[in-house]
Amino acid sequence: MKNLILLEGGSYRGIYTSGVLDVFMEHDIYPDCVMGVSAGALNGLGYVAQQPGRCRDVVLSYGMDPRYVGTKALRKEHNLVGFDFILRELQHVLPFDAESFYDPARKFYVGVTNCTTGEPEFISRDHCSDFLTAVAASCSMPYLCRKVKLNGEYYLDGGASSRLGLEFLDQHPEYDRVVVLLTRRMSYRKKKPSGLMR
């Protein structure tokens, strides 16, 4: 049997996911594979690197910093969200265990939306030369962030095409035990947009 954990996105609601993953790490619970969409991709970084508390510390210490989301991010990175700040600069303050993260025993994928097809795609850490850019693509919300170019294709937030990344299961039937971490209740259904938003 192979185990998989799917991590839903949800922006700041992802703090719930980071708490659940911290408890998993405290109890040495690690699956064969992790797949994260949007904020779930960010949470997956700390989980796969086996760094309890790191994702929580990033959000609680820097989540309101204008370099994280806001005017400084917009000026410096031309994005409302400062992915370079979150994924690269913060490593100097909150060290990231890259050696543990890149351990081939742990599989990690992020869900993205292909801007040409509008379909979800799943990028493997093991087959991507710039995986942190793939994580940024997974979190790049339409209209708020620029499209991210990776391997000649443009991508945006994985949640735009697949909130949970369930299509991953069709592409990877080898995972027969699946845990899905949600940031909303199972009964949640998104309301139809009104007026001009349709």
Regions found by a protein language model. Give the residues of each.
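Patatin-like phospholipase
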Residues: 1-37, 45-198
